[in-house]
Amino acid sequence: YKFVAEDLEGTSPKFDVEDAQGVRWKVKVGQETQSETAATRLLWAAGYFTDEDYYLAELKVNGLPKLHQGMSFVSAGGTVHQARLERKSKEEKKIGTWGWLANPFLNKRELNGLRVMMSLLNNWDLKELNNSIYEVNGERRYLVSDVGATFGNTGGATSRSKSDPKDYASSKFIGKVEPAFADFVQNGKMKEVTKHIP
């Protein structure tokens, strides 16, 4: 892999690389790498559009300079540890974001299924910025494009976690069940996303 540029947006260290075939990848390091890769696999298996993510325990990057953040994941010779690679398709163009409470799929079972999946994954970062609309060959695809804040505890600012199997295993899942709907436990942002799901 060849270093292209550092991405300073967001809270997780990220940079772009290019492989030998000329394919661009967004590399993310840090706490979210394993949880995000696992979450995208589960969402894809359930039939939802996702980013194409892969986890590599080690990744050799040629020409890697000193990064503004994330150097604790880099060792001598440009070896990056605990990396998530997200494929950047030339056919895919981001055209916007979508909100949980305002989108073309309100009251549809597919959106309700996605709401259940967010609960199952314990995704506590459900802000609109993490939901993308991509255009691929004239087709619009709506997806949750950042699922790194998963597999932990959905608690408040001081008690929430991500990529923590122990916290995930001990967290509550179902809050309330009625004949026509269920409420799932969500202590993070956008609690209403996981409430009153038919």
Regions found by a protein language model. Give the residues of each.
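Acidic-enriched, low-complexity/disordered segments with a strong bias for Aspartate over Glutamate
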Residues: 7, 16-19, 51-53, 125, ...
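C-terminal catalytic region of ATP-dependent kinase domains
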Residues: 138-198
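Serine/threonine-rich low-complexity intrinsically disordered regions
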Residues: 50, 60, 107, 176-180, ...
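Conserved kinase catalytic-core segment
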Residues: 35, 41, 93-163
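Short secondary-structure boundary micro-motifs
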Residues: 1-2, 103-105, 167-168
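Conserved ATP-binding subdomain of kinase catalytic cores across diverse folds
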Residues: 1-100
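Detector for methionine-enriched segments
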Residues: 71, 117-118, 190
